[in-house]
Amino acid sequence: MPRIDADLKLDFKDVLLRPKRSSLKSRAEVDLERTFTFRNSKQTYSGIPIIVANMDTVGTFEMAAVMSQHSMFTAIHKHYSLDDWKLFATNHPECLQNVAVSSGSGQNDLEKMTSILEAVPQVKFICLDVANGYSEHFVEFVKLVRAKFPEHTIMAGNVVTGEMVEELILSGADIIKVGVGPGSVCTTRTKTGVGYPQLSAVIECADSAHGLKGHIISDGGCTCPGDVAKAFGAGADFVMLGGMFSGHTECAGEVFERNGRKLKLFYGMSSDTAMNKHAGGVAEYRASEGKTVEVPYKGDVENTILDILGGLRSTCTYVGAAKLKELSRRATFIRVTQQHNTVFS
């Protein structure tokens, strides 16, 4: 019999953070770096825990080179060849601590990932990425990768509920990607009717992960620096961004003009565009679950990085958190009916 869960679930747009008394004199005093030791790999990582999504428009080597300068992380998309990786490792050895190799859950994916990790042993992060992290096959794949790479830190997802977070952590994953359908170019919710409001998903999944000394990534749903702050406030250890990093010089694809405006393409990894490019088209048994959009060309990503980090520091000063680590402890969310004044939007 169908069941209705009557508990209210909230998204970033449904809340604001309540300001609190603060002893901080300036945003400059806020420390955004975090240090994590991961449950299964036992590896330690230090940096600003914002990750560029492993989408082939934004998760590029060019993006990783800039992100690394800010101690930020990039999940490199899975469509680079072994030779591409070797060239990147030769030209940018300083970036290799701040990138992950991405893989699907197929045999070909595993073989390609293995060859990359053997050729570039400095890379210690693996991102196992499937649209539906609830399949038994994926859980078994995580166990297989953990057995094969016992000292690599494994990110795995995507899921949105605590019981699956726990299962993936106990199967060998260190960091669980949380989010089904919130992305700016994702249409899973409209095509399938499946999803979970991102703020509630993060709060619930963080609680489950932290109880096992695991970690989570809030993946998708951020439209502005304030949403990034809300994700951290909700308990996310890392926040993964795709759309907010789209349209920059460091993104894949050419700049083109339409009606006098400079634009770049940005598309979901389950879109017609991505499947035509990488899988020879959309298989007849499935539907596209992503969209392709033309986004304004924004120039170098440096300004966007500074805007996000500046907003995050400002959030911390408003709630009295001297470190990003303290933000979730200082966060009180209030439900609202309006986010901001829209007169000049």
Curated annotation (Swiss-Prot):
The active site is at C186, T188. Pfam families: IMPDH (PF00478). Keywords: Metal-binding, NADP, Oxidoreductase, Potassium, Purine metabolism. It catalyses: IMP + NH4(+) + NADP(+) = GMP + NADPH + 2 H(+). Disulfide bonds: none annotated. One of its GO terms (biological process) is response to cold. Belongs to the IMPDH/GMPR family. GuaC type 1 subfamily. This is GMP reductase 1.
